Amino acid sequence: MESVAYILVLTMTLAVLFFAIAFREPPRIQK
C-alpha cells in the first residue's frame, strides 16, 4: 500500500502543476 500511496501523491502533484500552468497561460486549444 505504500507504493500505491506514493504513486497517488506523485500523480496529484503532477496534476496540480499541470493545472497551475494550464490556468496561468492562456488556453491554446479551443474547441
Swiss-Prot record:
The keyword Cell membrane appears for this protein: no
Transmembrane region(s): 3-23
Compartments in which it is found: Cellular thylakoid membrane
Keyword presence, Signal: no
GO aspect biological process, one term: photosynthesis
Source organism, top-level taxon: Bacteria
Main location class: membrane
A GO term from the CC aspect: plasma membrane-derived thylakoid membrane
Keywords: Membrane, Photosynthesis, Photosystem II, Thylakoid, Transmembrane, Transmembrane helix
Coiled-coil region list: none
Membrane topology: Single-pass membrane protein
Function statement: Found at the monomer-monomer interface of the photosystem II (PS II) dimer, plays a role in assembly and dimerization of PSII. PSII is a light-driven water plastoquinone oxidoreductase, using light energy to abstract electrons from H(2)O, generating a proton gradient subsequently used for ATP formation.
Protein family according to the UniProt entry: Belongs to the PsbT family.
Assembly mode: PSII is composed of 1 copy each of membrane proteins PsbA, PsbB, PsbC, PsbD, PsbE, PsbF, PsbH, PsbI, PsbJ, PsbK, PsbL, PsbM, PsbT, PsbX, PsbY, PsbZ, Psb30/Ycf12, peripheral proteins PsbO, CyanoQ (PsbQ), PsbU, PsbV and a large number of cofactors. It forms dimeric complexes.
Protein's name according to its UniProt entry: Photosystem II reaction center protein T
Organism expressing this protein natively: Rippkaea orientalis (strain PCC 8801 / RF-1) (Cyanothece sp. (strain PCC 8801))
